[in-house]
């Protein structure tokens, strides 16, 4: 089976006819498109980029949701400001607001611990383990039994991999479960904040400019990775030393110009380009509109409840940024979808696939039943999603904590670690602890209670048959309750729990299930009461998941074979694993609403043009003065008569690529990917080379802001290779 799958996918790649700028390619696939890369301008041998422990791939790291890269031999890491936002917020107080004022550690001793649970992951190996995950026995199973067998096999593969201490291993699904790859990563656990610009630079334009062009945002920040004195990953300790990466990126201070080759290496989260037409219809017809509505309500409530309360506003700053980002993203997708022919094209392509399958008896026998089954299975999943959508917004934060703690106590009682749930094995305990510890910095009872009350009122107004009776009962609620009645019951629940206290909450981490059952803490009692129903729903979901995996994998096998027959490529959708995309620096001929063009670069002039002195369009006085006096230093571009701030490129990225280094033809750092344009976010579903543009922060602006404005000379010197053996000294 494995040999057949590999030949099928490889053949699809060799027949590649995708747009030159389309595709999030696995490193091992790059030689297959080597001629295209060379023609586009790559100076490196594409084969070198398949070697994950060599340059440049070894310099590219994951932060577990964002991408970053090593930029010095002393473990200096650069990423986006919005990727480090949680750590900046975590270290901020009303008295010392690093979000507002920025932060610079002049010495190693001044560097601050990142938010609990922060990690730097360095991918060192990727192996195809399809035959181990879907072994002959598992291949015969379906439903919940299949899900359980797949998880058991994954845990076994991961456990073997993690015998190499200091590494985190995961199994990632490709092509809808057709293939599985083992990803082995060095896990660096001591991460520290080195430098971030003030929010008026790192988030200039705020949510108004998010996903928009022209853009003038200095979306960059710096971490440093630390290890024990023996060079191995270790928990935070003052005795730890900077990690010395085998490879790091050099900064190309000359930057790029229009038409230059660029590529992005990173960890894109998820794309949906191979989805069924029914999935497109449900997502854009119901799911995204519901998400936008709920997100808008969340933002309004948080704004109302934090107004005039600085400490609460700081606590929810990272949460608000995250909600706002996806709120605008999903609305942008909906706007692009309206009037488009995406669904019609998806339906036509699906009909053509089915016709191709049905035209041959052998193909019909191999693929027919699963293609027929997948549509009804997806419909079943969508119905569950629709019915339980609001439920996901109703839970108080402390109830979530109580449920996690009780599940942990239950799983911990199982002596065989391999039989524990994924997410609750011993390898996961440090992460669970860190997440529970971090709640204090991102929680406010008034805000949390208002959110729960608002969404519970909506949920309890649904027909009783559409409500989860066990959940409603566990919280002491009843269908049809008014918001005032709900509020009164929530007051009792919050007053009866001590989980908001960190010491109390963390003490539960070491208690057994019997202690939970005996507790009179209101949220713990609710968690215990919900356990049986949680298992019932989990069993239901696992059964459906197993059926979907089985059918979807065969659907993808048929799709690859069909496109093979037409000489078309089928690269895998993004799944948070290391990928490479390439393109060029380019504007657009019709970017603006009036049909006028977008030039590829913005400059410092745009900052002063947008400056209002208030809110999202405030800017530091020192920056404005430097712009007025044309203190461009080494970073001015004569043709622009200014310093370039941001630029556009025809790169294929998505969420998770934030912080990805933009590299030139020699794999030197020329910027950081941090956004896309609003009308191109639909590329997650439907790539259009004419409109899709990535927005990057120009490395020349980063260097200018640090050197000329913020006087972060120690960081600039380290980036330039000066005094790198003693950073910050």
Residue map of PLM features:
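Terminal presequence/propeptide segments associated with secretion/organelle targeting
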Residues: 2-5, 9-729
